[in-house]
Every structure is written in structure tokens, then in C-alpha cells.
A protein has these predicted regions:
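Short, flexible helix-to-coil linker/hinge segments that flank and couple to helix-turn-helix
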Residues: 101-108, 113-152
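The feature encodes the CheY-like receiver
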Residues: 26, 71, 95
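Conserved acidic segment of CheY-like receiver
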Residues: 14-26, 30-34
């Protein structure tokens, strides 16, 4: 099968997303935002690391959107655990911190992207699509400052 056919075959199903945030209002907003996209669907939500890991055990998830600050652990620690158990899982870190340091730490933990919560909704969707398609995404304000070895 050539690459173009395989790519279109992979896009026949919606990208299944797990939303992890300890604030219900943020989770619900992300769920609404994601479910408006024709190629994306939220298949599970979690308010903490335990619920997130349980969700991953119970169903197929393609991509996880993880808050960097959870009540029971950091989103970075959760990302490391998820990537260890599910190496093909794509992780996008969502953070209230607009910080180069946190962006670098997120990528080192195994995340494919880092987006600040203050970004416009459209930017969050762009970030989801980019990481889903195998690219790295970092909030615009961080890109210019990101060293080329940020994931090393």
C-alpha cells in the first residue's frame, strides 16, 4: 500500500481523544471544542492520573490532552507513565504557564506538543491536528525561543 492510500485509510476513523484536567469546566470546554471537529472525538475524560490510566486500559485512545498541573500528580509525570505503557499514544500538554522551561520539560517527558491555555480555541485545534499528524507543536510565543535540542 502506498503512503498516500495508507494516510487516507488512517484518517477514515476519527482521532480518539482523552481529556485530562482536574477542573471540570476546562474538561467540558475542551470536550465541546474537540467534538465540533469532524475528524476528532473525545472518547474519555479524567480528572486525575488514576482515572486517565484506567481510561487508557479500557479503550483505544489515539491522543491525550493533559493539563500540566493535576491535583494528584504533575501532567509531566503522567505523560512519562502513559508513554512508558502506551508508547504510540500522542500527548499534548495544556498549561496555564506560558513558559519556555515548561515547554521543554513537556517535550522531554514525551509530549508531542505544548499549548498555553490562554491560546485561542483555534490554536488548540491546530495543535491537536499537528501532533496527530506527527509534528511537534509549541505555542507560538515559545517557538522563537526554543533551542533546537529541546527534546534531547
Amino acid at each position: 500500500m502506498n503512503a498516500e492510500k495508507e494516510h487516507s485509510k488512517n484518517r477514515e476513523h476519527k482521532t480518539r481523544i482523552l481529556v485530562v484536567d482536574d477542573h471540570d469546566i476546562v474538561r467540558q470546554g475542551l470536550i465541546q471544542l474537540v467534538n465540533q471537529e469532524p475528524d476528532l472525538v473525545v472518547c474519555a475524560e479524567a480528572e486525575n492520573a488514576g482515572q486517565a490510566l484506567d481510561a487508557l486500559e479500557k479503550q483505544q485512545v489515539d491522543l491525550a490532552i493533559v493539563d500540566i498541573s493535576l491535583e494528584d500528580t504533575s501532567g509531566l509525570e503522567l505523560t512519562e507513565k502513559m508513554k512508558l505503557c502506551y508508547p504510540n499514544l500522542i500527548v499534548l500538554i495544556l498549561s496555564m504557564h506560558d513558559s519556555l522551561l515548561y515547554a521543554q520539560r513537556s517535550l522531554r517527558a514525551g509530549a508531542a506538543g505544548y499549548v498555553a491555555k490562554h491560546e485561542a480555541a483555534e490554536k488548540i485545534i491546530v495543535a491537536i491536528h499537528q501532533v496527530r499528524d506527527g509534528k511537534i507543536y509549541v505555542s507560538d510565543s515559545k517557538v522563537a525561543k526554543m533551542p533546537s535540542d529541546a527534546t534531547s
